[in-house]
Amino acid sequence: TVSAIDLALQKHPTPVGDLFAAIRHGRMKRCFSRDTAIRYLAFFMTSRAFGRSGFKQRFPDVQVIHPLNPELSSWQRGAVTTEYFNAHQRTVRRLRRILARKREMQKWCKKWDAMHDRYVKEREELQACKPGGLSR
């Protein structure tokens, strides 16, 4: 079965190396590193949550005036709020924890399948060499 995190964080093999895609809430970003893809996925999720809840993601934009030529003014984007930054960091940590747990579960399932295959094989061998008088 495919989990939601498998759909949100996909790995595509390419001739030049693996390509990671972060896909969530109708947004997509392709990255060359898994770390960057996790950060983008956290960004998509945090931005969506803040947008829906009405919390401010950024401080207001500020107009910066050039010190020598005042006609060359520009707008500087406001920095992210502390609440948004902390929420983003929490989301990254939670995503990493989910992925680590998933890897751990996959390793355990692999060991379980190997043990089960050995058991079935041994059982079939015992059934094949069973003496005729036994009813079991």
Name the predicted role of every residue range.
Residues 1-136:
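Intrinsically disordered, low-complexity linkers and terminal regions
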